């Protein structure tokens, strides 16, 4: 079989929280003013109470509200595919599977948390949300989600992506989102960069600063983000929970699990339910290889330093313990805009530091070569971010070709690339550089 489908009734009813399964406690966020663990009231200035509770929860399973499940059912469960054409093309004995998150209305995994965050903000009496977006995947997911709960949504979009991907902006505006190129002249955080250079390419760190500044300055507004924090990764575990069931249906357990990493949410969403088996002490699963893939232009895990740093460029967030290239690092304007982040989710960083996760970084051109191979064998044009996972899956499959091992490889196709065709155009005409 090529495709493994679950019924609507099999959408997971609970999210998996990996926090209580960690072999040692996660270092808490610190208040930069006191260097003490941040007090909940500081977080409540920008997040609603239910999400702050989820951020620090020690419960392994957290119920998914009915209202969230109802919207999930528009596209979930998502299919698991066996990439047989790709296997044949590579001539590998490996079996390659991918979880297809591109089938959501916004075209990526991002609505899994966007819908949940919009719901919790709505029941907390919030009227407006601000956020940042790189390639526009997160901004479009939050615009999509907020319309169901009658919330206003303002998106600060990294300027290089705003210019590269006009159709993402149109998508956000179709779903009632207001899109502002960042850095902008509308916030103190943005103005500093904007006045130096009105065409500043921007970064996720700067856009986060702008969105947080606005949320903190208005009573009716909270901040929402698409990656990095524990509650965001929690909501994404629906991906891996479904994939576990589907892999059982296919009759396999993966030897290798792969995901692209920018902030860590799609990677964690697929891998954490499998890593939970390892953390619970299942000896049969301890050889599981979990591989995080990042761009060489922003090699956070592979070249970053494990330390406390700000989550944004200006220093408005608490300090979080993560692998970081420095909060003022501005990556080159690669097309995988969703991977241009100086840090990574603390949970992903902790598991990497403890040796449960491996990491690899690739050049942009080799990633697009893998993307085109995938499009020409499996038919789906992947998002540049997802193509990083495809490149790693191909490399793992080619290793199996050399060794003769019949490994089972599972990767996350986190989104489609139909709004990224200008990048493909450049690649196909030899104009894409590293």
Curated annotation (Swiss-Prot):
It is an enzyme of class 4 (lyase). It comes from the Bacteria. Its EC number is 4.2.1.20. Its cofactor is pyridoxal 5'-phosphate. GO terms for molecular function: L-serine hydro-lyase (adding indole, L-tryptophan-forming) activity; pyridoxal phosphate binding; tryptophan synthase activity. It catalyses: (1S,2R)-1-C-(indol-3-yl)glycerol 3-phosphate + L-serine = D-glyceraldehyde 3-phosphate + L-tryptophan + H2O. NCBIfam families: PRK12391.1, trpB_rel. The beta subunit is responsible for the synthesis of L-tryptophan from indole and L-serine. Belongs to the TrpB family. This is Tryptophan synthase beta chain 2. It comes from Aquifex aeolicus (strain VF5). The lineage of its organism: Bacteria, Pseudomonadati, Aquificota, Aquificia, Aquificales.
């Amino acid at each position: 079989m090529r495709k493994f489908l679950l019924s609507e009734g099999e959408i997971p009813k609970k999210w998996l929280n990996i926090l209580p399964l960690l072999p040692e406690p996660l270092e808490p966020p610190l208040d930069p003013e006191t260097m003490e663990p941040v007090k909940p009231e500081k977080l409540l200035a920008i997040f609603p109470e239910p999400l702050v509770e989820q951020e620090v929860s020690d419960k392994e399973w957290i119920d998914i509200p009915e209202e969230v499940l109802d919207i999930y059912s528009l596209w979930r469960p998502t299919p698991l595919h066996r990439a047989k054409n790709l296997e044949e093309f590579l001539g590998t004995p490996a079996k390659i599977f991918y979880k297809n998150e591109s089938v959501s209305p916004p075209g990526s995994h991002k609505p899994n948390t966007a819908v949940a965050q919009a719901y919790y903000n709505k029941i907390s009496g919030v009227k407006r949300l601000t956020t940042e977006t790189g390639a526009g995947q997160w901004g479009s997911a939050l615009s999509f989600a907020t319309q169901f709960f009658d919330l206003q949504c303002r998106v600060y979009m990294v300027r290089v992506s705003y210019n590269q991907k006009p159709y993402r902006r149109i998508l956000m505006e179709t779903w009632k989102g207001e899109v502002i190129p960042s850095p902008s002249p509308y916030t103190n955080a943005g103005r500093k960069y904007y006045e130096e250079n009105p065409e500043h390419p921007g970064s996720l760190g700067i856009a986060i600063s702008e969105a947080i500044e606005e949320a903190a300055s208005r009573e009716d507004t909270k901040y929402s983000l698409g990656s990095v924090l524990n509650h965001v990764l929690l909501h994404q575990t629906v991906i891996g929970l479904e994939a576990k069931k589907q892999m059982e249906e296919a009759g396999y357990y993966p030897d290798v699990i792969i995901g692209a990493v920018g902030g860590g949410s799609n990677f964690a969403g697929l891998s954490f339910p499998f890593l939970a088996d390892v953390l619970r002490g299942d000896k049969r699963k301890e050889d599981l290889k979990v591989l995080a893939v990042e761009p060489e232009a922003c090699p956070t895990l592979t070249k970053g330093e494990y330390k406390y740093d700000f989550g944004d460029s200006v220093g408005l967030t608490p300090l979080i313990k993560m692998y970081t290239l420095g909060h003022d690092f501005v990556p080159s304007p690669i097309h995988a805009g969703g991977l241009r982040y100086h840090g990574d989710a603390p949970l992903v960083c902790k598991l990497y530091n403890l040796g449960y996760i491996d990491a690899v970084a690739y050049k942009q051109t080799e990633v697009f070569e893998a993307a085109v191979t995938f499009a020409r064998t499996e038919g789906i044009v992947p998002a540049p971010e997802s193509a990083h996972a495809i490149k790693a899956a191909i490399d793992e499959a080619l290793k199996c070709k050399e060794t003769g091992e019949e490994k089972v490889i599972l990767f996350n196709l986190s989104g489609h690339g139909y709004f990224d065709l200008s990048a493909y155009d450049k690649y196909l005409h030899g104009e894409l550089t590293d």
